Amino acid sequence: MSLLKMEYNLYAELKKMTCGQTISLFNEDGDFVEVEPGSSFKFLIPKGFYSSPSVKTSLVFETLTTTDNKITSINPTNAPKLYPLQRKVVSEVVSNMRKMIELKRPLYITLHLACGFGKTITTCYLMATHGRKTVICVPNKMLIHQWKTQVEAVGLEHKISIDGVSSLLKELKTQSPDVLIVVSRHLTNDAFCKYINKHYDLFILDESHTYNLMNNTAVTRFLAYYPPMMCYFLTATPRPANRIYCNSIINIAKLSDLKKTIYVVDSFFEPYSTDNIRHMIKRLDGPSNKYHIYTEKLLSVDEPRNQLILNTLVEEFKSGTINRILVITKLREHMVLFYKRLLDLFGPEVVFIGDAQNRRTPDMVKSIKELNRFIFVSTLFYSGTGLDIPSLDSLFICSAVINNMQIEQLLGRVCRETELLDRTVYVFPNTSIKEIKYMIGNFVQRIISLSVDKLGFKQESYRKHQESDPTSACTASSREERVLNRIFNSQNR
């Protein structure tokens, strides 16, 4: 551990690295506090901060020669086969680590690789290459299966622990598997942190962007007080502030043959209201809507918009244009609404729900991977990051208030490389609730812009349903407003 005074140069380096964000670290008293320049406190500077050679230091760090936590079940013939770009990542990692060892720097690397790159299989290859006992830490149990599959393919002895770190510690007294796959809440147990710090050399933090290391979390404390010998952060959307804990980054661009289209489903709605809607509208400008909770609640009861989403999905699915669909909402009640209506239309053999409150959901996800046609309805929280269904070909985004990191992760669910190349996303920028009309339009525009500018999607307008739906007849004034609405939306984009 490095307890240092917060001198100007150190503070400036940290501030630059975090893009000017507030910096919080543990001080010499063990308090997690905001760092101020010229503070009289000494601060615990994370080991991974020094992994970059651009950070000047006289500190000397331990190397792998000081430990003997080697994998016993390694079999070189079981190493996974990698694509050329994945092999390039491995080559970069090995080259960087040689330099780190030579310079006596911490062996900490962030693998910033696009969604669908194959971070899991690439990291398993590196794990087998290093031959060191490994802890794989995931943010939720839904990610366990994809790691289990790849670790088993490499032939490594492993143990999975989802519930009850105390029972795991008892088992570890008699056996110490080569690979531990655990959920991050295990790191709240100090005895477990001490154990893996002593008996395991490599720590892999999957989906590292899901942790804000500027908060006093279990992962933050573990990396500060029980830093592993080697560490990988895996992410497609890194948090700038997390670089303080893992300051060496490898980012190799991925070229894709996927044909990616984002359909903007424009529609003009007559104003819609109910007593419930009028009650929630009163809360839009209050503190209870700070995180747009009521904005999303209003969307969930926007019946005309919900019906448009259903009509579009049903039309596309029945036509065979799309076959393996992910429907994403922000709120659980919104998810349940779509699930029940789709279940009535297509039945339980086709429609599935990704419910965080159902313990059987991970098993259900495994079972639908082999299906040719299905509709999977879930929430952004549960399926927005790390959902492992590579065959997904389409995504319906029913919510609107999503930050850039979540957008990129969500769109990545349909950007996995498979033999089928067409990928389609549907967004719905309109609402029948006039009080949130422009707000929703702006939020959805952010999704469209990021998908086109950063992720290579092609934007298209979708009007099949509105043009063919006999219920869409309207008065001349309504038609005029519809035209003006479309012009406004197109100019906005």
From Swiss-Prot:
It is found in: Virion. Its EC number is 3.6.4.-. It is an enzyme of class 3 (hydrolase). GO terms for molecular function: ATP binding; DNA binding; helicase activity; hydrolase activity. A motif (DESH box) lies at residues 206-209. SUPFAM superfamilies: P-loop containing nucleoside triphosphate hydrolases. Belongs to the helicase family. Poxviruses subfamily. This is Transcript termination protein A18.
